[in-house]
Amino acid sequence: MEFWQHIYSNFNVIAFSIFGLKVHWYGIMYVIALLLALLLAKFFVRKFQLDINEKHLDSYFIWVEIGVILGARLGYILIYDANTMYYITHPWQIFNPYINGEFVGIRGMSYHGAIIGFLIATLLFCKKYKTNPWIFLDLVALSVPLAYVFGRIGNFLNQELFGRITNVPWGIYVDGVLRHPSQLYEAFLEGIVVFIIVYLARFKQSFQGELILVYAGAYSLARFICEFYREPDFGIGFVLWGMSMGQILSFIMFITALLVYICIKFKKVNI
């Protein structure tokens, strides 16, 4: 286990360089996640014979990716970043991938911000093309979880979002301190386990939009659990009743998904 515990000391976050441009493993994992999500979406469209045109699907993923990036970055700046006012007064720096002339990529993304950007992009896309947003949302619920696994692996390889201090034998040393590899816990619970739940729910689906609500509930619950092993966000710490900001946002997300599900399922609300 010694090699594993000291993996960060033996691993370079930079995969390779092209003409002086450093390509990080995180970026590679992010691209893999995007491609996998699209491929899975096309697979599920065929498998479940969904009424979605492939050309529309390709366009939709472009819209969604833009929404996700904007939402994730802005969400991080507004919720987590200690330099919020700096970015508000210097908006051109929000997506600046350089620090002191060195390319480091765009760092600082919020999953919950990404969700908001994703929903806005979906609604705008479906309004423009006059399509049912719930069909696309349910498809995303099936396609994203397994792709999400690579995103969390990217966090692990990038040596960020590490866990709390521990003494478990599978912990990893971060700056000389043994910590939980919480990114991998998240990859498993928020990715693989959530996918299994949503996939099984597909065979008992009773209304359009049910899968995205199941996903929201399952993800938020998994994230809430994982936050117990993840180091609270720097500069924020524990926010309320010993909970991290991630747990508070996940709790809100879970309650929202549950209420919408109950209203639709049992109150026969039309969507």
From Swiss-Prot:
The terms under GO molecular function for this entry are: phosphatidylglycerol-prolipoprotein diacylglyceryl transferase activity
GO terms, biological process = lipoprotein biosynthetic process
For membrane topology, the record states: Multi-pass membrane protein
Family matches, as InterPro entries: Lgt
Q: What is its main location?
A: membrane
Subcellular location per UniProt equals: Cell inner membrane
Can you tell me which residues bind a 1,2-diacyl-sn-glycero-3-phospho-(1'-sn-glycerol)? 152
Q: Key word Transmembrane present in the record?
A: yes
Among Pfam families, the record links this protein to:
LGT
Q: Which residues cross the membrane?
A: 25-45, 60-80, 103-123, 134-154, 181-201, 209-229, 235-255
For this record, the Gene Ontology CC terms, alphabetical, are:
plasma membrane
Q: Name the keywords, alphabetized.
A: Cell inner membrane, Cell membrane, Membrane, Transferase, Transmembrane, Transmembrane helix
Disulfide pairs here are: none
Q: What is its EC number?
A: 2.5.1.145
Q: In which pathway does it act?
A: Protein modification; lipoprotein biosynthesis (diacylglyceryl transfer)
Q: Which family does it belong to?
A: Belongs to the Lgt family.
List the PANTHER family: PHOSPHATIDYLGLYCEROL--PROLIPOPROTEIN DIACYLGLYCERYL TRANSFERASE, PROLIPOPROTEIN DIACYLGLYCERYL TRANSFERASE
Q: What does this protein do?
A: Catalyzes the transfer of the diacylglyceryl group from phosphatidylglycerol to the sulfhydryl group of the N-terminal cysteine of a prolipoprotein, the first step in the formation of mature lipoproteins.
The protein's name: Phosphatidylglycerol--prolipoprotein diacylglyceryl transferase
Q: Which organism is it from?
A: Campylobacter jejuni subsp. jejuni serotype O:2 (strain ATCC 700819 / NCTC 11168)
